[in-house]
Amino acid sequence: MPTRKISIPPGYLKADMHCHTYHSGLTGHMEAFEPMDCYSSPQALYDLAKKRGMDLVTITDHDSIDGCLAFLEKNPDAPDFFIGEEVTVQVSEFKTNVHVAVYDIDEKQHREITHLKGNFDDAIAYLRTNNIIHALNHLFHGFHPAKQGYAFLEKMISSFQLLEGLNGAINRGHNSITQRLGELFPGKSLIAGSDSHTLLRLGTCFTACKAANKTQFLQQLQSGNTLIGGKYGHFHHLFNDAMGVYLNYFRDLAFRREVHVNWPFWKEIRNGAGWFVCLPVFFSGALGGLFVQQCIERFRQVKYEELIAALSTGEGLDQTIVDPEFVSTTR
């Protein structure tokens, strides 16, 4: 299995900077049965992350900090936990969304970010003004490089100091492209996270900073003094995640009753039976859909490589693209 192996020097702390719980909400697939995007609980995620060697823990649910707040309600004095969120921000000029990870925020900041996420420029301006740690997750996810590729890259590169250079759900080729961007442009640093939607891959990717405690770790992260390591994604990781969600749906209905606890009995029977009957469809659909997705992404990867090659030879973006105001406020 492809791995980015690094030797962590003494005095460094590690954290998986991208992971989810059931507070990420509903998935966009098989909506009639209302499956969640993830079935991991905040406490289970924390416990397993610590068991797998993470010194610090965060949760980055989609557009929600409810999982973080639920954990802190039960563990108010946890010295090794900080609030995170993966915010879906609209970039209207490219007719796409990007996922922006934000860290060490409070409830008021979450509400402000939620209010601004419909406008990329306003959201980034708020994050900079308030000195909030933020990173661009999986840079090329959902954006076709043939559609204003240079312009999109220019906007993203000028907007972020931190880029997710290792995502555990993405193959080595795509991760390496972001890593090369981090090398091409001054002032850019990388973070890593498993992007786990089940507990299977939790902690398989990590960000390390030289620090003795959470406060120092976040300061180093803000300054871009990071190391990244872990396992690259593969087709079978995504398939395992999909099947994990399928099985955990049944587990919650039959035994745990933690996620779909408010469903009436008739709805549990209807959705559970429908979910079971759809197993062949789900299995073949997940297998086929993920295979097609991988083929498309491999084609796009070629286009990304062409963009990066042009950048490295000076044919594309100005390699000095850095926002001086941003650098001066975060380094």
Model-found features: residue ranges?
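Divalent metal-coordination and catalytic microenvironments
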Residues: H18, D61, F81, V102, ...
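Histidine/acidic residue-rich metal-binding segments in metalloenzymes
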Residues: K117-N130, K147-S158, G173-K188, A192
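Structural recognition of alpha->loop->beta junctions
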Residues: Y150-R172, C209-Q219
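A conserved mid-domain beta-alpha-beta active-site/ligand-binding segment of alpha/beta enzyme cores
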Residues: K210-C278
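Histidine/acidic-residue-rich catalytic or RNA/ligand-binding cores of hydrolases
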Residues: G25-H29, L69, K95-V100, H144-F152, ...
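Short acidic/histidine-rich active-site segments
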Residues: G187-T204
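An N-terminally biased module of ancient metal coordination in phosphate/nucleic-acid-related enzymes
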Residues: M1-K95, L200, G289-R331
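Binuclear metal-dependent hydrolase catalytic cores centered on His/Asp/Glu-rich metal-binding motifs
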Residues: T96-I133
